[in-house]
């Protein structure tokens, strides 16, 4: 089960997400469902028009919906291949 404490080591595909901050202002407020993830990007299928958008992880802050609560994660913490991120030991530097 995904919790705010293990989200960095969990599969992200299928989660609802919103971009809350980004260096690219046109991405802020984008909402959708994660459909694909690579080492440096996350692909989101938008809720409003079902188009797929590729978001670089290092320029954004993501707000994930977990059950009925929300958690914000800095995109740089998600960098790396998904299968390697699941194995990587993560320091407890991110306050929840």
From Swiss-Prot:
It comes from Methanococcus aeolicus (strain ATCC BAA-1280 / DSM 17508 / OCM 812 / Nankai-3). Coiled coil: none annotated. It catalyses: Endonucleolytic cleavage of RNA, removing 5'-extranucleotides from tRNA precursor. Consists of a catalytic RNA component and at least 4-5 protein subunits. This is Ribonuclease P protein component 1. The keyword Plastid does not apply. It is found in: Cytoplasm. Part of ribonuclease P, a protein complex that generates mature tRNA molecules by cleaving their 5'-ends. One of its GO terms (molecular function) is ribonuclease P RNA binding. The keyword Flavoprotein does not apply. Its EC number is 3.1.26.5. It comes from the Archaea. SMART domains: POP4 (SM00538). Keywords: Cytoplasm, Endonuclease, Hydrolase, Nuclease, tRNA processing. HAMAP family: RNase_P_1. GO terms for cellular component: cytoplasm; ribonuclease MRP complex; ribonuclease P complex.
């Amino acid at each position: 089960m995904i919790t705010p404490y293990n989200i960095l080591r969990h599969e992200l595909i299928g989660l609802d997400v919103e971009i809350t901050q980004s260096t690219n202002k046109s991405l802020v407020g984008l909402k959708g469902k994660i459909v694909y993830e690579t080492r440096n990007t996350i692909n989101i299928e938008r809720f409003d028009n079902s188009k797929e958008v590729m978001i670089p992880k290092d320029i954004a802050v993501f707000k994930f919906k977990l059950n009925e609560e929300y958690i914000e994660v800095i995109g740089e913490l998600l960098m790396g291949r998904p299968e390697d991120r699941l194995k990587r030991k993560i320091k407890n530097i991110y306050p929840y």
